[in-house]
Structures are given as structure tokens and as C-alpha cells.
């Protein structure tokens, strides 16, 4: 029965295929406007400002990182991204807003996908596409082929079919990448294997961000937001995407870039960092001289400014990659430190924490347990007496020290590269 089902699915595959997206051809004026935008000075700063004009509230760093990552779908080795945060923190909203800037023909949006679905796309249907997954829980069944598509940039599946004479034969279904994958989840630990292949972005869950969003919502309801102008900016971004062309990138400074020793899993983190530097170079392609190597291949070169921009944008990503705590637990610990400073008390109990931080008791218990297990807090009291535990922070400045070390390391790399260029050891 399985063979018959596979046979039926193969026969019906063409009929079930969605209609192919027609590529929008730009008018000469649209192309000229898009290229002119890419040639303007301070491109990243200007892009960040324009993103805020598209209805994206706050999240300036996260939105710029995500946009640059989405650009890499056109390259041979794209980057991938994962949005993390508590339920209702705006993960899916941010992904949707950024993906609206990508042409429809270049993206595939998925809410839920079945186990073998990826194998039944046409061979090049996913090539250089952006795959958007609303919630990673909905793609749990395809995690293995999805990881293979991310890493090896192609997947294949061999199935058994019957020919017209009833004889069994095998065929291999092959789907080619590369693809750029973007997804959202609240479960950082569960999807750790997938997270290792992605740049991790944690949504802004501060009260200031809540105020910014509420203010935008009230302005929207009052008719004070120019929706037509927002759409015009979105169309401009889509046209910018259409004029970006694949091109080889060479980073002459790559061998001088060394990750901080504090970073966990340095091999994949280094790949992500170098890839993001190339993403910035790729986005600046209309401002770079196109060169030709000995084999006749065209390429552009990474500048020191690209590396500096990547270090600045990915600073928090590198902090999280160097922290053994999850982002949620880290934020809880930093809130405890702030609470200790405000109250002037070195110790606090569960009731005080819950009342002051206004948080769910279950989450609080989990965070306290994790912090105690890793040695960040010390608990004293009677385990048989409810509410008797008193907690104290072991070291108040450990995170600031970690961030300072990483910051100094990145600055020393930039200073070293500039010195090499100045001395003529590296040709700029």
C-alpha cells in the first residue's frame, strides 16, 4: 500500500504543484531608483532608518540583521536565522514585517509541513528561496531534511514505484538548494541543533518596547499612520532585492579574525560571523570595485568597514553564544541584580522576587533552579519548609566582565587589521 501511495503521489505531483510565481520585471525608472539607493553613503544606517518607515516598531538592530540575512538567499552559502522570545513577544510579527520586504517570487511561507513534503518540490523550486516558518513546532517532522538542505544544500529521497507494466522500480527525488531558512520559537533548548546553524535573534521584551508598540497601535487606530507611504517603502525594498545580483566575495582580512575564547561551539559561530561579514559586503556590491581573478571569475572584496559593522551588529549575538545561560535565564538574573541594587539587600526570597518582578511562579522556579545548578546564585534554607529559601547572587559583575572581554577582543582585531593595512602587510 505504501508503494501504491508513493506511486499515486508522484503521478499527481505536477497537478498539485502551485502555479509558478511570475517574476516582476522592473521598469528602467524602478531599477535606477533601487540602484541609486544602494549607492548612497552610510548605506546600513540609511537602510535601518528606512526599515522603521515600513511599520517596524523598534527592533532596529534585529530588523537590520534579519534583512541582511534574507539577502544572502541569493548567494551560494546563505545564512539562516531564528527568532526567539516568550509567547506574545513579537517574534512572528517581526519575521512577517521583514519578509514583506522580500519579493513574493523569492520566498515560501510555511505554517505547517508534513514529513516528506520537502522532497516533492520540483528540483530547483527551492533554489535561492527564503523559507519562512511561522512556528518551528509546525515543522518538527521535517527538521532532518531541513538541516540537510541548510548544510549540504540539496536533499534526495529514493522511492519505489510501479511502471506501466506493473514492475517495481526505484527513482530518486532530488531537491536542490541553497535556501535561507527563517523560523520562530519559544523553545531555545529543544531546537538547539537547528539553532547552532542560525543567527539567533532575541526579541526586545522591555517595557520601553511595549510603550513604543502601544504608541504605534494608537496612532494606527487614530489614522495618523500613512499606510500608503509604508507600502511605497516596502516596494522600494523589494526592488532593491531584485537588483542585487549573486557575486563571489573575497575577504582578504578573514585570516586575522579570531573568535573570543569564551564563545561556545566556535566552529559554527566562526562560519556565521564570516558569512555575516560577507552579507554586508554583498549588500554594498554597487559601492565596490568588481575585480576578476586568474580564472576569470568576478568578485568584490570585503572592507574593514564591513567587518566593523558586522562586529557592531552581532555583538549581542556573540554575547549570547558565549553565555552558558539561555537568554531568558540571563535576563532573569540581570533583573535579580537590578533588584538587589534597588532594595540594597543581598538576599531575597521567592515571594519578594515574584512580587517585584511580577512573573509566573513556574518560570521563576525554573530560572532559580537553573541559576543554582550553574552556580550563579546560592540558596540557603530548609528544603522541608515551604518559602524558607533565601537566595543570594554569587558574583554581581560576571556578565559585564564577559561583555567587556569580548568587546576588547573585537576592538583589538580591528586595530590589528588597520595596523597591517597601514604597514602595507595587507593590501586594502
For every predicted segment, state its role.
Residues 29-34, 46-53, 80-82, 128-133, ...:
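Short hinge/gating elements
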Residues 61-73, 100, 274-279, 334, ...:
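Contiguous, well-ordered alpha-helical segments that form the cores/surfaces of helical PPI scaffolds
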Residues 55, 64, 69-228, 238-243:
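Conserved ASCE/P-loop NTPase catalytic core
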Residues 16-60:
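Charged, amphipathic alpha-helical linker segments immediately N-terminal to NTP-binding catalytic cores
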Residues 324-428:
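Terminal-proximal interaction/regulatory segments of ATP-powered molecular machines
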Residues 171-179, 186-334, 338, 420:
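Phosphate-sensing "switch" segment of ASCE/P-loop ATPases
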Residues 99, 274, 365-369:
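Short, hydrophobic-biased segments on the C-terminal half of alpha helices
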Amino acid at each position: 500500500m505504501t508503494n501504491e501511495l508513493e506511486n499515486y503521489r508522484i503521478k499527481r505531483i505536477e497537478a498539485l504543484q502551485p502555479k509558478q510565481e511570475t517574476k516582476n520585471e522592473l521598469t528602467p525608472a524602478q531599477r535606477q531608483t533601487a540602484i541609486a539607493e544602494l549607492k548612497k553613503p552610510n548605506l546600513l544606517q540609511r537602510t535601518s532608518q528606512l526599515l522603521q518607515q515600513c511599520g517596524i516598531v523598534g527592533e532596529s538592530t534585529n530588523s537590520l540583521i534579519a534583512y541582511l540575512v534574507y539577502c544572502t538567499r541569493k548567494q551560494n552559502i546563505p545564512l539562516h536565522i531564528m527568532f526567539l522570545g516568550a509567547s506574545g513577544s513579537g517574534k512572528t510579527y517581526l519575521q512577517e514585517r521583514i519578509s514583506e520586504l522580500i519579493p513574493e517570487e523569492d520566498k515560501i511561507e510555511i505554517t505547517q509541513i508534513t514529513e516528506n513534503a520537502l522532497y516533492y518540490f520540483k528540483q530547483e523550486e527551492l533554489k535561492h528561496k527564503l523559507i519562512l516558518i511561522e512556528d518551528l513546532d509546525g515543522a518538527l517532522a521535517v527538521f532532518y531534511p531541513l538541516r540537510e538542505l541548510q548544510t549540504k544544500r540539496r536533499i534526495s529521497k529514493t522511492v519505489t514505484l510501479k511502471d506501466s507494466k506493473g514492475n517495481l522500480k526505484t527513482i530518486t527525488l532530488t531537491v536542490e538548494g541553497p535556501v535561507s531558512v527563517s523560523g520562530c520559537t519559544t523553545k531555545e533548548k529543544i531546537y538547539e541543533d537547528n539553532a547552532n546553524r542560525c543567527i539567533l535573534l532575541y526579541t526586545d521584551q522591555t517595557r520601553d518596547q511595549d510603550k513604543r508598540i502601544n504608541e504605534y497601535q494608537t496612532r494606527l487606530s487614530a489614522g495618523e499612520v500613512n499606510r500608503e507611504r509604508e507600502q511605497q517603502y516596502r516596494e522600494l525594498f523589494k526592488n532593491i532585492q531584485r537588483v542585487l545580483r549573486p557575486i563571489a566575495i573575497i575577504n582578504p582580512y578573514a585570516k586575522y579574525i579570531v573568535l573570543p575564547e569564551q564563545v561556545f561551539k566556535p566552529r559554527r559561530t566562526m562560519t556565521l560571523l564570516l558569512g555575516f561579514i560577507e552579507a554586508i559586503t554583498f549588500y554594498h556590491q554597487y559601492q565596490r570595485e568588481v575585480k576578476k581573478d586568474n580564472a576569470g571569475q568576478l568578485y568584490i572584496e570585503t572592507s574593514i568597514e564591513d567587518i566593523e559593522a558586522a562586529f557592531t551588529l552581532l555583538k549581542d549575538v556573540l554575547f549570547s553564544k558565549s553565555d552558558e545561560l539561555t537568554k531568558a535565564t540571563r535576563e532573569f538574573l540581570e533583573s535579580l541584580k537590578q533588584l538587589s541594587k534597588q532594595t540594597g539587600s543581598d538576599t531575597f526570597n521567592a515571594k519578594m522576587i515574584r512580587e517585584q518582578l511580577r512573573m509566573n511562579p513556574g518560570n521563576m522556579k525554573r530560572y532559580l533552579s537553573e541559576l543554582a545548578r550553574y552556580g550563579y546564585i546560592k540558596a540557603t534554607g530548609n528544603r522541608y519548609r515551604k518559602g524558607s529559601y533565601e537566595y543570594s547572587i554569587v558574583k554581581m559583575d560576571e556578565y559585564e566582565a564577559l561583555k567587556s572581554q569580548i568587546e576588547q577582543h573585537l576592538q583589538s582585531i580591528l586595530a590589528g587589521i588597520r595596523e597591517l593595512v597601514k604597514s602595507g602587510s595587507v593590501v586594502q
